[in-house]
Every structure is written in C-alpha cells, then in structure tokens.
Amino acid sequence: MRLWISVCLCLAGVAGWFGAATSWLPGPPSVTEAISQDAPAPGATPAKVTANNPDNGVTISGHSQENRFVSVPRFFRSGDIPKFAQAVVNGTPLLTQCDVKNRWPDGSLKFAVISFIVPKVASHGTEVRFQNQASGNNEGYLDKSAMLDAAYDFDGTISLAGTASHVISARSMLQAGHFRYWLRGPVVTAVIIEDRDGRSEEVNTDGGTGNPLHPIFEAWFYPASHKVEIGFTVENSWASSTPAKGARNQDFELTLSTGKAAPAVRLKQAKFTQLIFTRWRRAFWIGSDPPPIRMNWNPRYLLQTGAYPNWDIDGLPNASALAAENATNTRLNPARFTIPGYDDIYASKGKGLGGIGKYDQALNAGGQADWIGPANTWDIMYLLTGDPAMEQMMVTNADLGGRFPMWYREADHKAGSGHYFDHPNFGSIDTYGRVVSINARQQVTLNLGNWRPGCAGEERDAINLTGPARVSGWGASQDTSHAPDFAYIPYTLTGKYYYLEQLQMDAAWSVGAYVGCFSPNPEPESYYRQGSMGVIPNISRQAAWAIRTMAYAAFVSPDGEPEGPYFADKVRNNVAMLEGEHGVALSIKDNAERNAAYNYGKVEQYTQSSNPSPLGAWRADDCSGPTPWSQVGCYATPANNMTPSAFGAEATFMEGFILVTLGLVNQLGIADATPLLQFTAKRYFHVLSDPAVNHYSIEQYVYPTRTAAGWVKDWDTYQKLYGRLPGGWRGFESREDTDNAYSLIAMTAVSYMSRLSVDGYSGQQVWQWFYTNRPHLRACSTYSPKFCIKPLATR
C-alpha cells in the first residue's frame, strides 16, 4: 500500500512561514518571466535508479488538477545531485527552481527547497524524480512592485487591542522595503517581511517605554496562479542589558486578517498575555485555498541521506498507531490549541492538564511523553507515513510551541563581555538580531527559574528585565532533561523560515539555559557550563536533549551563516568533555578549547577519568549531583530490582538517551563520538552476546555499577546484584510501553555501535541478534516507531 504525504504548502489555514535569508538585503528587481516546461538546461544529468542511486523522488496525489505549483524541501545523499536538483515527471524534465540551503563537503546538494509546476496531478499519484541540472533557476523572481500587483491582493494585518492599540500591515512594511528574500525564482518568490535592523514596526500594548512586540510576516508568492500564502508572527523575544529595549509581558486582543481589497478575518483571539521570550505563528492563504495535494516523501530514500535517525521502514506506523496518536488530541482541552494555550499546570481547574497543543506545561513530569526522544512521535509519524492528521499535528505544535518562555533574540550590538557572536572578544560577527550567543554573553543563564545563579562577574552578561519574570506555569520546565525538539522535522519538511529560527533559538536556549558560570581553576565535582565553552556536566538526559537539538541546528543551518559553526562548536566541546570524563583519548583537536573541555571532563562532577568503569558503565550514578562512593546512589534500590549490595546503579534509559544522541552526532558528521560509543559498547555487547550473561537484563530499568568496594568488575558480580534476573522479554501492550521502551532505546543505541567490535564481539552481529530475537516490529507499527531505528549503512 502506498503511503501519501501532504505538502504543507497546501494546508488550509495552517501552513505558512518561510525561511531565514542568507542575505539581509533584498535582491535586485526582476520581472517575472512566463513559466514554461522547456527541455533541461545544458548540463542536466538524467535521473537513473540504480542500486547505488535509489529512487530519490516523491509521489504527489490529491484532487485531479493541472499545472499545480509545488515546493518540496528535500535532503539528498552526498554525491547524488552534484549541482542543483531538477524535477522529472514521466521522463520529462520540468522547469525547476532550486533554492539551495546546504551543500555537502564535496559540494553536492544536501538540502534545498525545490519548486516546480506539475503538469497534471493524478488522484492515484504522480511520480516526481530528481536529477542534476547546471542552474538553480533563481532569476525571474518578483520584485517589490510585482508583489504589490493587484492580482495578488496582497496584505496581512495584525490588529492588537490593549491599553495602546495598533494595526500592523504586511503590505505597508513591504512597500517600505522592510523585507528580504528566502526563495527566488520564476516558480515561487518567498520573502521575510520584517524590520529587524531598525525595529521601526514594533509596538507595545501597555503604553510603556519601549516596544517589545516584533512583527514578522512571511509570504510565498506563486505567480502561475497568483496565490500567496502568508504567515503571521509576533515575537516578544528581545534580550537586552537595557530593560526598555527588551521583552516584557504584553496584554492584548488579537485579530489576523488577509487580503487587501476585501480583508478576511482569519483568527480572533480574546485578551491574553504574550509572555516574555515567547513567539507564535499562524498562516493562511490569501483568498481561497488551492486544492489540497498529498505527497509520499519516499522515506526509504530520505532516511538514507543520513539527515534523520534511520527509522525502520519495516515497522512503519499502521492505521491503529496513527489513530491512537490522533486520539490523544481529541481528549485535550480545546484551549490548548489557541495561541495562549491553557494555563493550569496541576489540572486544579478540572479541565485537564495545562499545556499548548500536545505539549504539557509540565514538560519535565516523569514518565513517557511523545516529545521525549530524537524527535516528537507525531513528527516521526508524519515523515514516515504522510498521514494528514499527523501533518496537521506537526504544523500546529510547531506553530504554538513558542508559548514556553525560552525564545531569545539578541537586542544589543557587541553584547556582553565577549562582544561577538562567533568567538569571545576576537570574533568578527555582531550579536544583534541573532540568537543569544554565549560567546558574547559568556556567563548568562537563560533560565527564568535561575536567572542570576551568582556567577562571579555575571552582570556584564546579564539580560535585564523591567521587573520580575511572571510566566505562571509556563516557566516550570526550564531545563533540557525532558525537552522536545520543536522544529527540526517541521523545518526540513516545510522549508519554512519560522521553523528554522525556532530550531536555532531552541538550540541557543538548550546550551544557554545551563548554569553559565566560569571557573578558571575548576575544582573536583564542578558542574558549571564554563561560560562560552557551553558544556553540560549534568544528568545524561539533560545533556542528551541539549546536544541533540544543537546537532540538528549545526547540521541544517544555512551555509554561509554563523549559526551552524556556532552550534557545531558547542557540540564538539561537549563531546570533548565527555571524553575527558570517561578517560578515553581526545578525538577532536581542532582548537585549544577542545583541550580545555577535555581537561574539564577530568574534574567535573561525574568524572571517572582516573578510574573508568571496567565494564563500560556510562555513569556510576546518574543522579542530580555526585554521590559519594560510600553512599548508596538514587537508583540502587530494591524497588529498582537491586540487592542491598548494590551501591550504585545507572538508569538504562538515561544512558540510552545520551548514546543515541552521540550516535546522531556521529551520523550527522558534527563530531566523532566513536571513542565514547566504543567505551560503552563493552557492556551492551557482553549482555547481548556473552552466553554467561542474562540477555534479557538489557531492558531492565537500571543496571548495577558499583558495590561498597568500588566498580563492578566482572559479569558474575554484575548479575548477582539484581534482585531477580528476568526470564524473558517484556511485552509491548500500549503506546506508553513502546514509545520510550527501555529495550528499544537500547536497540537504537546498539544500532549506532554496529561498526564497532569489543572483546571479539562484532557490533553488527550483536545488533542483528538483538533485532532478530527481541520481538518488536509489531509494536513499532501498532504503537510507536520512535526508537525503532536501524544502523545506517552509508550516507
């Protein structure tokens, strides 16, 4: 059965927002040329389907229609498309606009938004493949006057009614020249309408000093049909050392309208408070919506690009899994699907838990959650199946997730003690308008619950507010221990700029939220971020999800912009610190800071550098803070199936989380985490392959790490520290059992060790045995595919 995927561009009333520009200046004026389906330009390479170059295309379906515009965000394998992608339908090359955002190190196409006109969309599906062409066809885009042509009826207004009231017009901002290009060419012109430099379009609704509300519109113009999709955003995200230049809570009623000749009200929101450091997005088509189309993303190829975890296509979610995922939405309070969400973190009002979309206010609550993992469950399901309900869920949650107060935009030039975005004191890139950089604000802590932790000299890096931060239940989860990845899949499956910035802001918060103090001579058991170093010596899950999101942002931030290198730098520092912590050789030696991070790993609070675990235990105890070896750790309890002789135990899920993240870091090419995976592979390979070890124990909640005498040193002692050894595999009986299942987390971790060998055990054979003998595919299909991940053969 074919799997169809909706293109987000065609969602009625929910799609919108485009992308971050690689240039702050509008491109030169250009008159739109007629679109024709000509032969390929010289240099085009015919698409071929071979064993080494599998079908790289998509399949578009929906209502039968002709000359349908389509924009497809797409990753390609390294080397598959040397220059630019061209769409081919039934052997006929189409005029194709290819807006390149990223290239592989060999120069071949990595990620682009590919736009073209499909001659005919068949209800049963029209296959589109991609081949190489010499040009991206990025001329012939709309200039300002063309976008203002009456045929587009272009306008979008944001009406804010408060103590002070305002109407902000996208058309007026465009006329004033406050825009920059995101996509350019004859098929689609996408612009970001914003005055980031001058802040001339900003307002307040409290009548106070300074204007914290920052409007952004994003418009995608399709000349062939004169259709425009417009996204609306209001940010309250400015971060400044001068309170009047920064964010402060604002109360207002909201109305969004589209069109110029006869404006249509698309959204009305009763009075609410837009909190500090929040943002939101809503998007609509001007006039009537185009007929919907659906697309098969071809996950078999897409996953081979290495851009995503290699989810198992033999365990794709079935109708039951999709229905169950969607059913969770219908049980939620409808107020959670509004811009302000529903504020009741403890469900004291009798209308269910507070939250925004599917995200609970209490993100850090214990137990399984759809947002814990390499990606949100619903995002994964959309990528793998294209189910329209999952698409709607992805867009809605990505649009509304900005309700949590964690989205910061730098308001100061040469901010903080470090002054520069790219390097403290000796950089070259100004901080203004970008995400908050800890290279500049070296000791800032982006945690409203720990706003001034007391670092020596932190005031030089401070973000100052007009008063106490009042964010009610939305500020309850200000660390990354249960943090979602809000925007990586939404950005890469829509190409929308809002989601790109959401990803970058999320990544910046992920490293900035940890205690920012710097100590020039760190003492044993230190736990600071070490200022601009950006390391996170804390419980494994807190580090795991911060590194995950930073790695995604490093991988997909547009080439030529500083955000990608910035996040890659922080990921590499964390890998170096963890190598120092575990006493393995430093693998990243590109600058002196890696040595500093490595040496810090030798003294931070979880270090085992001078006395590493003989059996490859990731941590002696993964508790909040170090546990003296003379004391029993937090996980070594009879309730967790440990005997009284066990003084320490590691949580298998926490260890699995960090190992899965390190595997992703390897796969994405951000850093070489192989030495760390090699260190921990010893336990996994022995438990799963050594005939003297109980294989089923791999899925226990915790495993023993130490006794009163020190580390567990042999497998006989290891097994005797369990209260009872399991006699078989656990069953998967629900979504909750499967979504964060310990055995599937372990299987995913082992998938990233498949090329290793330890004590004569082959990683590929260990993984194959685990995959074959531990029943799981039915659960992946029926419940959740989140941790159903296989080794990636090649990229």
Predicted regions and their residues:
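Sec-dependent N-terminal signal peptides
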Residues: 1-23
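Secreted/extracellular small peptides and ectodomain modules produced from precursors
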Residues: 2, 6-8, 96, 621, ...
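Sterically constrained small-residue positions within well-ordered secondary structures
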Residues: 7, 78-80, 147-149, 223, ...
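Signal peptide processing junction and immediate N-terminal pro/mature segment
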Residues: 17-38
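Alpha-mannosidase-like glycoside hydrolase catalytic domains involved in N-glycan trimming
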Residues: 31, 35-165, 178-181, 186-197, ...
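Generic structural signal of hydrophobic/aromatic residues within well-ordered alpha-helices
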Residues: 68, 147, 151-158, 170, ...
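Glycine- and charge-enriched low-complexity intrinsically disordered segments
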Residues: 166-172
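Catalytic cores of extracellular degradative/oxidative enzymes
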Residues: 184-795
